[in-house]
Regions:
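Short, well-ordered alpha-helices that flank and scaffold nucleotide-derived cofactor binding pockets
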Residues: 18, 45, 75, 79, ...
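Short, flexible micro-motifs
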Residues: 11, 115, 139, 151, ...
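Short beta-strand-loop/turn "lid" adjacent to the catalytic site in phosphate-handling enzymes
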Residues: 52-110, 147-151, 156-159
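A general structural signal for short secondary-structure boundary/capping elements
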Residues: 50, 110-113, 135-137
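Gly/Thr-rich phosphate-binding beta-strand-loop-beta motif of the actin/hexokinase/Hsp70
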Residues: 1-25, 122, 128-150
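Conserved phosphate-binding catalytic cores of ATP/NTP-utilizing and phosphoryl-transfer enzymes
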Residues: 97-130
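N-terminal phosphate-binding loop and adjacent alpha-helix
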Residues: 23-72, 160
Length: 161
């Protein structure tokens, strides 16, 4: 099983994939005051509620816009997975993960990993020539060209700002 995290400013969305299929998804509030132990307990409780065996987790992928939480989540994964855990914890943007997308913008470092991942997912699901709108803490509009290239985007205040 693969454990995934989308760590945002407001929420952490956790997914469990088995055989490339999403089998469960949860949402926790983002809280930098919690410890890695706290997050480990939260995730264990969520898995137990759904009868998911944490020891069967073989890898994890983290996409994050909150660096402090990224470290906490990495620590928490190590606390509740098996000592024989041989999978890798990949952090998008930190582990030289090739996202295989052409960023057609002046400053590539200004495009958040969340927006790049949204663009890749949109292209995989719908093909090119897309505008992707993400209503998160901020509302983002991102444009994907016909060949899957990222053409740019805009960040606006979110609905609660």
């Amino acid at each position: 099983m693969l454990l995934t995290f989308d760590i945002g400013n407001t929420n952490i969305v956790i997914g469990i994939f088995e055989n490339n299929k999403l089998i469960k998804k949860w949402r926790l509030p983002s809280n930098t005051k919690k410890s890695a132990d706290d997050y480990a307990v939260d995730i264990i409780e969520l898995c137990l509620t759904e009868r998911i065996d944490c020891l069967k987790i073989s890898g994890a992928i983290i996409g994050s816009v909150v660096p402090t939480l990224t470290g906490l989540i990495c620590e928490s994964i190590k606390k509740f997975t098996s000592e024989t855990f041989t999978g890798k914890i990949l952090v998008i943007g930190q582990d030289n993960v090739d996202l295989n997308i052409d960023l057609k913008v002046k400053n590539k470092n200004e495009v958040g990993h969340d927006r790049i991942i949204n663009s890749i997912a949109g292209f995989k699901k719908f093909g090119g020539n897309l505008i992707i709108i993400d209503f998160g803490t901020a509302t983002t509009f991102d444009v994907v060209g016909k060949s899957g290239e990222y053409l740019g985007g805009v960040i606006a205040p979110g609905i609660n700002l």
